[in-house]
Amino acid sequence: MIEYKNVALRYTEKDVLRDVNLQIEDGEFMVLVGPSGSGKTTMLKMINRLLEPTDGNIYMDGKRIKDYDERELRLSTGYVLQAIALFPNLTVEENIALIPEMKGWTKEEIAQKTEELLAKVGLPVAEYGHRLPSELSGGEQQRVGIVRAMIGQPKILLMDEPFSALDAISRKQLQVLTKELHKEFGMTTIFVTHDTDEALKLADRIAVLQDGEIRQVSNPETILKAPATDFVADLFGGSIHD
C-alpha cells in the first residue's frame, strides 16, 4: 500500500500541495485528475523521490519512501511520461533492455521477456525490435515506452498523461491495453490525467485535485452520482459515460 500522510509542498510563497492524505491499495488503478497546476504530477513524482515533500510523509508498505534506497526504489517503479522518452540512438530492443541490464538479467532473460511483452502490445520483435524510435509512429513509440516501464516487473507503474499527445484512435487503443496489462500483471498503477473521460474509463478510484488539495476520492460511479463539491460536479459535468 502507498499512503500519503499530511503531505505538503511549498515553493517560496506558493503551496503546490496542502495537507494531502490518500491511501492507494496494492493492485489498485488510481487516477489523479484535475486541471493544470492542481498538483497531480507533483504527487506522482514524490513516489519515486523526484520531488520531496516539505511536510508530511509518503509510505510504501508501512515504510517511509525517503528511507528506501533511492536507486532500488526507482528500479522497482515503472514510469511512463507524456513526452515519449526513448533514446533516439538505440533500437527498440536496446531501449527496452536498459532496466533489466541494470538489474543484472541475462541476455536470454531480456530477449525472452522483450519478445513476450512486445507481442502483447502488438509490436512483434522480429518486425520492430531492430527499429529506431524515429521509424515508429507516436502510438508505437508509446507502446515501447510502456513495455520499457513494465519489463522490470515493477510493483508500481506511474503514468503521467501518457496518451495526451496521441491521436484519438491511438489513445483509445492504449487505454484498453494499459488496463489489460494492469490486470494481468497485478501491479499498482497511478495514472495522471486532466481528461475526465479517460479517468472514468480507467480508474478503480479517482482522486480529484484542485489547487493542491484533494476534493474527493471515490469510484467513478460515485464521482458521477454524488460529487462532493461543486468543483467536482462541474469538472465531470461534461464527461461522456455509459
Swiss-Prot record:
Binding residues for ATP: G34, P35, S36, G37, S38, G39, K40, T41
KO phenotype (gene knockout): Lacks ATPase activity in vitro. Does not import ergothioneine.
EC number assigned by the record: 7.6.2.9
The reaction(s) this protein catalyses: ergothioneine(out) + ATP + H2O = ergothioneine(in) + ADP + phosphate + H(+)
Gene Ontology terms: biological process: amino acid transport; quaternary ammonium group transport
Matching InterPro entries: AAA+_ATPase, ABC_transporter-like_ATP-bd, ABC_transporter-like_CS, P-loop_NTPase
Subcellular localization: Cell inner membrane
GO cellular component, one term: plasma membrane
Superkingdom in the source lineage: Bacteria
SUPFAM superfamilies noted in UniProt: P-loop containing nucleoside triphosphate hydrolases
One of the Pfam families matching this protein, by short name: ABC_tran
GO molecular function: ATP binding; ATP hydrolysis activity
Major localization class: membrane
Ranges for domain ABC transporter: 2-236
Keywords annotated in UniProt: ATP-binding, Cell inner membrane, Cell membrane, Membrane, Nucleotide-binding, Translocase, Transport
Physiological role: Part of an ABC transporter complex EgtU required for the uptake of ergothioneine (EGT), a natural low-molecular weight (LMW) thiol antioxidant. Probably responsible for energy coupling to the transport system.
Family: Belongs to the ABC transporter superfamily.
Subunit structure: The complex is probably composed of at least an ATP-binding protein (EgtUA) and a transmembrane protein (EgtUBC).
Protein's UniProt name: Probable ergothioneine transport ATP-binding protein EgtUA
Organism per entry: Streptococcus pneumoniae serotype 2 (strain D39 / NCTC 7466)
